[in-house]
A protein has these predicted regions:
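A short helix-turn-beta junction within AAA+ P-loop NTPase domains corresponding to the substrate/partner-engaging
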Residues: 129-148
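Walker A/P-loop nucleotide-binding motif
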Residues: 18-38
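Sensor-1/coupling segment of RecA-like P-loop NTPase cores
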Residues: 104-131
Length: 149
């Protein structure tokens, strides 16, 4: 995919909120996905300066889940305009985390919030990813973050 097409996808995603381009999933090496996430957040802030953006990596997501369980608390749905989860591979196969993620993605989609998820490979290649989460992610746009791939 060439860079100009990739940027058109990101620009469309950040300018038009809601379900049209939701969710956005891209995969590849960390330096590529991080660069695209940085660009998405910068672009989103340009078009929506007051937006509440929540950016978590899989490790932070898991740690927050563990804290909630240990404290006896309930999972809360993040009230953000843009939810970014980096490296879904780190959540895949962990039932409690996947259950929480499914609820979050469901609420965000129903409430027309933007979702960005990254991974190391296409969702079909993440064999331990729960089918219902794969379906949620695959309902949007997916592409390789590596320019020219």
């Amino acid at each position: 995919m060439d860079k100009s097409f990739q940027m058109k996808i990101v620009d469309a995603f950040t300018q038009k909120t809601g379900n049209t381009y939701n969710s956005l999933y891209f995969y590849g090496e960390h330096q590529h996905t991080k660069a695209v996430v940085d660009y998405i957040i910068e672009s989103y802030r340009t078009h929506h300066p007051e937006a509440n953006i929540l950016r978590l990596d899989a490790e932070e997501f898991r740690a927050e889940s563990i804290r909630k369980v240990r404290s006896g608390g309930h999972y809360t749905i993040p009230t953000c305009d843009l939810f970014v989860l980096e490296y879904i591979d780190g959540v895949a196969g962990l039932e409690a985390n996947e259950q929480r993620l499914y609820g979050i993605l469901d609420w965000l989609l129903e409430n027309n919030r933007q979702i960005v998820i990254t991974g190391t490979a296409p969702t079909a290649a993440i064999t331990n990813l729960a089918p219902r989460i794969r379906t949620q992610i695959d309902g949007g746009i997916a592409y390789s973050a590596a320019i020219g791939k």
